[in-house]
């Protein structure tokens, strides 16, 4: 059985992420224990709230260096994906610098912010997270900040402007949407992370 650990970032959506894995039949544990995090097979970095509050929590829990040195697969969700980049304009805070890119506020194009609801996702590179998921499938988003498309983007979406819906580099993967709120496609993505992403 794969040992899946949800990193306790002190944010609000930890239990909903855990329930999503429970529904798929996977055992998960929410923790900020450094030894449990280091020994996990796969890790989830969830996030809801602001980048500066999340980085403060990670610093207080001595998790920043631990996360930066992980060699097993890590999936960042929503703010968790944004924390994987170099810097967030939200609070003007340096983030984990796991994947190049910056997180910026979505520009005003007349659409309401935050983006809240279903949006189409276009895969631009092969990625095991999306195995069996149809191109241009819909996923559920809630966000006002986003990562511009770059060389690490594996999927993009559009909300007035294009942005990275998913990024990946080495063992680090991130999705801007909430798979735990994205129905069968989100469930399949989480299953793919457990069963298809190598470790």
From Swiss-Prot:
This is Imidazole glycerol phosphate synthase subunit HisH. GO terms for biological process: L-histidine biosynthetic process. Heterodimer of HisH and HisF. Gene3D superfamilies: 3.40.50.880. Keywords: Amino-acid biosynthesis, Cytoplasm, Glutamine amidotransferase, Histidine biosynthesis, Hydrolase, Lyase. IGPS catalyzes the conversion of PRFAR and glutamine to IGP, AICAR and glutamate. The HisH subunit catalyzes the hydrolysis of glutamine to glutamate and ammonia as part of the synthesis of IGP and AICAR. The resulting ammonia molecule is channeled to the active site of HisF. It comes from Haemophilus influenzae (strain 86-028NP). Pathway: Amino-acid biosynthesis; L-histidine biosynthesis; L-histidine from 5-phospho-alpha-D-ribose 1-diphosphate: step 5/9. InterPro entries: Class_I_gatase-like (IPR029062), GATASE (IPR017926), Imidazole-glycPsynth_HisH (IPR010139).
């Amino acid at each position: 059985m794969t040992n899946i650990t949800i990193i306790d970032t002190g944010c609000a959506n930890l239990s909903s992420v855990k329930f999503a894995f429970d529904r798929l039949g996977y055992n998960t544990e929410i923790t900020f224990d450094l030894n449990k995090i280091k020994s996990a097979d796969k890790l989830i970095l969830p996030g809801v709230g602001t980048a500066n509050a999340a980085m403060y929590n990670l610093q207080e829990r001595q998790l920043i260096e631990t996360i930066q040195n992980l060699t097993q697969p890590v999936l960042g969700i929503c703010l968790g994906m944004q924390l994987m980049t170099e810097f967030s304009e939200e609070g003007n805070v340096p983030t984990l610098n796991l994947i190049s890119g910056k997180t910026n506020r979505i520009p005003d194009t007349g659409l309401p912010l935050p983006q809240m609801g279903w949006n189409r996702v276009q895969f631009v590179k092969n990625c095991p997270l999306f195995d069996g998921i149809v191109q241009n499938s819909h996923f559920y988003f809630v966000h006002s900040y986003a990562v511009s498309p770059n060389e690490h983007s594996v999927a993009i979406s559009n909300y007035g402007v294009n942005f990275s819906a998913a990024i990946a580099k080495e063992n680090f993967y991130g999705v801007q949407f909430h798979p735990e709120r994205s129905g069968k496609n989100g469930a399949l993505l989480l299953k793919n992370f457990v069963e298809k992403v190598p470790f």
